[in-house]
Amino acid sequence: MNTTTRTRMRPEERRQQILNVALELFAKRGFEEVTIGDIAAEMDIVRPTIYIYFPSTNAILDAIFENLLESYWQKLEPLIKSAGDIVPNPQLVSKAFRIMHSEPYLLSILRCGGPSFQKKRHAQFNKKLRALLEPYTNSDIPYISPIIGLLIEGLAYWAIQENIQDTEELANALEQFVSHGLDKR
């Protein structure tokens, strides 16, 4: 017999608790290895409680992605707006890399859930990045926004996977790379 006292939560608190627990489980085991039952067991609740909020683990993953992406944009948007009309700006790119590198869960979520989910999430990410960058871009380089976005995301993911300790050195190298590329136009 379970003697644990359950705590009643407001719906938004319960929803957020589900997202937090699911994120931790996805990070530990990988998205494909986590079920609604696993999340419920970790929370000591019954599965139907989770189904009140989310119809599937894919829906949970999408909600987590939205939250993480919003957090990233809230950190990135002021940097872009303060850069004025000098985007692409090498310093801005290295700052965006630092922010992305500090969001390992976002990077993991971008790469899990199968090809169709990855494509959908990358499309969301790139659409938002283009919307943020294009008003400030006076570049004659075609596709500059997705190039910068993929460079930042890919390098941040690689640095985490390879356990690169000196991210400042990597950010500076990225800044030099972008600066060199812009000087050659």
Question: At which residue positions do the language-model features occur?
Answer:
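Solvent-exposed, amphipathic alpha-helical segments
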Residues: 17, 21-28, 71, 75-82, ...
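Short hydrophobic/aromatic patch on the recognition helix
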Residues: 43-54
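Basic, helix-initiating cap at the start of DNA-binding domains
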Residues: 1-29, 33-45, 59
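Alpha-helical DNA-contacting segments of helix-turn-helix folds
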Residues: 61-68, 118-121
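Hydrophobic alpha-helical connector segments
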Residues: 63, 74-102, 148, 171
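Amphipathic alpha-helical segments used for helix-helix packing
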Residues: 88-126, 157-161
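Hydrophobic alpha-helical segments that form the core
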Residues: 95, 99, 139-181
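Amphipathic alpha-helical packing segments from all-alpha helical-bundle domains
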Residues: 73, 114-146, 169-172
